[in-house]
């Protein structure tokens, strides 16, 4: 383990593990994502840390359920992280 550590140029892996406020440039851990319903294949935009149950617009199946942090996707649902 080296004693000299470059604080101005941390590796991307180190930055990801840090708290969102203690990073070199602050950035949130949350994101929006497109979730595809396994039944009717409609796409719904869902927040990653959703605090309520999200239902499909077309067939009213449950797409994700809240946990203490990130929302848990239902089995069979596929998602894609939205670009900002």
Curated annotation (Swiss-Prot):
Residues 1-16 have a biased composition (Basic and acidic residues). Gene3D superfamilies: Zn-binding ribosomal proteins (2.20.25.100). Binds 1 zinc ion per subunit. Residues 1-23 are annotated as: Disordered. A zinc finger (C4-type) spans 37-59. Pfam families: Ribosomal_S27e. Transmembrane segments: none annotated. GO terms for biological process: ribosomal small subunit assembly; ribosomal small subunit biogenesis; translation. PANTHER family: 40S RIBOSOMAL PROTEIN S27. Component of the small ribosomal subunit. Part of the small subunit (SSU) processome, composed of more than 70 proteins and the RNA chaperone small nucleolar RNA (snoRNA) U3. This is Small ribosomal subunit protein eS27. It comes from Xenopus laevis (African clawed frog). The gene is rps27.
